[in-house]
Amino acid sequence: MKKPLMKSLLVAFSALLATSVVPLSSAQANDTLGQKVQYDTKAPVNDGKDISIQYWTWNDGDPAIKLAESYQKLHPNVKIEVVNHPWDDYWTKLPLALQGSDGPAIFNIHNSQDKLLSSYLEAYDIPTEDLKADFTGVEPHVVDGKVNYIDIVMNTGNIYYNKKMWQAAGLTDKDIPKTWDEFRQVAKKLTIKEGDNLVQAGFNWNGSYAGLYQGLNYQKGTLLFQEDGTTPNYNNETTKENLKFLVDLYEVDGVGSKDFGTDDTQSFGNQQSAMVYKWGWFANELKTKYPDVEYGVFATPTFSKDQPFAYDRYNGESTPGINKNQSEEQRKVAQDFLKYLLANDQYSLEAAKAYASYPTKNSVQEDKSLKSDPVLSVIAPRIKKLIWPGPFPATMETSAKKAAEEVLYNGVDLDSALENAQRQMERDMRNESFKSLESAYQ
């Protein structure tokens, strides 16, 4: 990311927390939504003839689902069938479906799967300059003057904690840890055992290492990629130190366990774990699947009280993709629905709330409904010290995850696990065109 973009993010984010609602434009008060990207709500779709398209996603809280309902009310002749696949199944089923002519006309995208999907994507039928005028951060997604998707929000990792468990342990807001050493002590207080059996984990990172290691490495000034910007930088002393730190939380401090389930998301939702590291999407996960959990959020600790090299990575949640292999009739409807999403401020607001993330649409960055969001208020002070490495290939996370599992479950030593993961990452990226954007961070 270029420095001017980061400055614009900081200014806009500060405004988000300090100002009130932006009034609707005169166009929005009539039949047209949007600023530069506009949508005519009265224009017929598919010449008014009945048509059905599919929208695929992996997320029950996907904001496009809610907007699909309002779109269908505007256009009763259009039916949008939402198909929800679990995350792990999604990336197997979607590419197979897109190869033929019967795949979904429009679908949810995660930028870590850019290479997997790029050959199936139809460029947006919206002028790129209009997108740039309405949204922050479009430029990194421009290819040959067009975009296949952009970021609707940007987010990063935080620590979520169970408020009831926190209170039961005698902790208050004054005990929010700033450093990892303080965090270890808090985690111990939150841990409950019956004999040798772990009943309540003080901190559970089972399933979250792939994202957690990146922020820990950044805090110590170690980038994810080597100086050439293309070679993974996983097998190093920083990664080793940080993985040992996480393992020691379990094996030395006893605040969690590799055997305490494989999914920290579910464990926190079932109120078996007191703290987890999660990104903005987790707020909506709790709202939709675990509404009884009373939770709080605080910034991920650092290794000292001094400002680190960076606090963490940040990433964007992507706008939907259009299937270029679908029929022209279906693609036109999909493009129309997409324009409805991007012109409609409500889509950005729903995304910001669903993912607890910073909205990229300029017209909603000052909306007062976002000011009280607990996650946004925690992200705000750190926004200038977050790194965007670009949409790196999935192996940077999948291979790292395997390394941690090898250490935890198979007794593989740290050096061997890191060497194996590094080798796998390099093998997977041998023919990649990816170039890290970390060098632009200042």
Segment roles from a protein language model:
Residues 48-59, 78-83, 106, 148:
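Short, well-ordered beta-strand elements
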